[in-house]
Amino acid sequence: MISTRGRYALRVLVDLAEHGGGSYLPMKEVANRQEISLKYLERIVPLLTRARLLEGQSGKGGGYRLTREP
């Protein structure tokens, strides 16, 4: 059985693969599309970043994107 955190992490990765197109997307957009609390995603995204599945950029036009092509 996959944990809730694991399911949500997978949903984030799939969402970025479908909507990212190589550009950085704010987690707020992903949270809204996936109907997941932004606060909960803020706990999951650092794990995906440490695993080198995502990379982040801060500032205007920032957000997260996949480190590899889907």
What is the predicted function of each stretch?
Residues L10-G21:
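Short amphipathic alpha-helical interface segments
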Residues K39:
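Key DNA-contact positions within bacterial/archaeal DNA-binding proteins
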Residues L25-E35:
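A short alpha-helical element within helix-turn-helix/winged-helix DNA-binding domains
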